[in-house]
Amino acid sequence: MKIAMLAPVAWRTPPRKYGPWEQVASNITEGMVKKGIDITLFATGDSLTKGKLKSICPAGYEEDKSLDPKVEECMHISFLMEQAHEYDIIHNNFDFLPLTYSRLIKTPMVTTIHGFSSPKIIPVYKRFNDINHYVSISYADRSKHLKYTANVYNGINSSHFTFKEKPGDYLLYFGRIHHDKGTREAIDIALKAKMKLIIAGFIQDEKYYNQHVKPFIDGTQIIYTGNAGPEERDELLGGAYALLHPINFKEPFGLSVAEGMFCGTPVIAFNKGSMQELIDDKKTGFLVNNVEEAADVIPLVKNIDRNYCYQWAQSKFSTEKMTEDYIKVYEKVLSL
């Protein structure tokens, strides 16, 4: 079985800091390498893999602003499609644009749908549904307009995270600084609970940051540490009393939620999107509806078994499980 793994080219694969789709593409690729699968990663030229790497884009366009995103994406996708005949399956982690090549190649394409950026893109998925094999990353994110081959939860490389039996004394917000992710709500929760909050993540919305986040940062109770790399992410997640995830949108999957539980850290999340699938309510954290409810459950976090958080994450969101699930998808597609 020869697999071509198509990663995005906004960031390096795996990303140095932020880059969730690139991270998932990397985790799948390295999982396949461990299984002895012949896999080639199509990503930026500075990407890292134990498999084969092919690239036409030198670096991520979000890291090198001299690169034009549309040009890099078109070059990258066509670079793979010109070689499609060399592979048994193309695994698309690049959203909808590669689908438009589906009828021009003979190689079957598996597409992991990492959420819908807008309802406006669904017609593209609908048009190519008959020739593509769609995989959802949570049942909550499925569109009623599409047919799916499987659901495969994102897998986390547990070796990158350290289980901590004893919690620290701070709350953690880990994610991009944006209204969707609820940075301001996390601040409000911490203020109500009278606990220290560490905010880690890149500023995606400068206006939102300046209006709703920056005024509260005092370096004592509310601390902003910037965008965190792998080592700092592990340290922050493992040392937290609880991870706050007060999202304002139906999130397809929250990588930081799973990562936190691998460290043994309970998660307090707004009950939207995939959160019911990620969190075992009252056992690995709490599903709440608003800031007040989140603040109210913070004293109860001490009753959560951090070892159970780890075991739950390992059973559902490990790279090993994700790899096995995708191998089943590949085998199913090739048997058709």
Named regions from a protein language model:
Residues 1-336:
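Catalytic cores of nucleotide-sugar-dependent glycosyltransferases that transfer UDP/GDP/TDP-activated
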